[in-house]
């Protein structure tokens, strides 16, 4: 704070090189926001937290950043290591003893690409660059630095270093033999499937994967994560976001896995006998996962974008115009019909209720109306958990960079993550010259389950949104509780005791429900638009109002009580 105040006083009115500071009253939201910013820009932001307790406040946001390969830099203080005034910065407060723990970085080290300590101010720039090198090298993720007050107060001579020699590792490609093996496998297969996970983080990979799917007519593409837009929804080769299982995976005679952590779940999705599996990615062995393996005949450590370009180049030279040959031409034609049938099935799920003035909307109907009402440039931030597949199938996103998901298991990401995405979109729209280019970027919509919404600390999220002028639309899918635990239980005990009782009996119910939109409105100083949608007719009235509110510069929060939840009681209606 002393350095910030000094920089402010020294400022002559010109552009400052000092970082822009954004105040976030909760560490989890702060790191989720930095995570969301990095998803769109690839640029790591720095999150400052207070010693061990602030580090713990980051919570599962560290897990999310690590799993989702999102580069961030976290800096935390350490309790002073002198107590009798030996150095400037020595202990001056009671709390300095209580926050002195044996190994502070151990709290988060297993989630970090680097965890280290400033031991002198004389090489602080080198240490920061070392941390950023590792955070921005694949697989990307968080870096953690800490330093005691004595080090922060150390007097040093001003010095410069050459920033051009501190870049991360350049992306690597496939070997020539690997390229030939993969192409041969896909071309010779009768039922090839490509499964992706993180490829869309680099937006340039999306058209490259489309080119590959066009060059091998008949191949199907599955996104097994939904963390980014990896493939356009409207393409005939696309199956969609499918987590853990799909009939096409079980039927495949060749599977190419590209940058994906969990392409299928063996207990839920048995594979065909003799299927040939090839895995490509920056971390094919998943070195931070103690238990992970798939029966791949070949594994290649390579960047998805580089690898896809190599595969396309080889195909264009060795196997041009397969679509004009049989059996590929027939497969290509069949895909068009198959995809049309899949979309028609999703359309049927999005049909309005028979009594729209009294019946709640389904998640599918809700999201189909969102797609029609929100602007074409909308970026969707999804954390819908048990409703996620319905959401993806109705939003039907085609544009790279316009679909983002937390990717990890630390629910609540989307609150801060959505603000980070909005901040990044405004920043990119301003030519990457200014953080806080208010409202210039894309329209941003968060779709979140009710339990996950509470995990996201909405009291902090909507205060930050108001202070820094980051208006977004939030849709809370209100189904009166956590349904994901019931699904998990019934996968193991499909006919057990738990399957026979209510969510209330399982202690996963939110009855009586909180005022979800009211929480956000209060946190925004009563400036946000808020509404509760109880029926399909309500939805058609409220959605345009909410979109207009966001476009006017204020946040909008809708609690949508979706069909399929247990009956709403009189005191909740």
Predicted regions and their residues:
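Active-site diphosphate/adenylate-binding microenvironment
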Residues: 1-5, 11-12, 333-437
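N-terminal alpha/beta PP-like core and its mobile active-site loop of ThDP/TPP-dependent enzymes
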Residues: 1-318, 323, 376, 441-443, ...
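Thiamine diphosphate
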Residues: 10-15, 83-99, 249-251, 301, ...
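Active-site nucleophile and cofactor-binding loops and adjacent substrate-binding regions
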Residues: 21-32, 47-54, 119-120, 226, ...
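Phosphate/pyrophosphate-binding active-site segments
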Residues: 119-122, 159, 184, 274-384, ...
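Generic recognition of flexible, low-complexity loop/linker segments
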Residues: 131-132, 180-183, 208-209, 243-245, ...
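A glycine-rich phosphate-binding loop feature that marks nucleotide/adenosyl-phosphate handling sites
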Residues: 146-151, 385-388, 561-563
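Short hydrophobic beta-strand segments
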Residues: 193-197, 379-383, 450
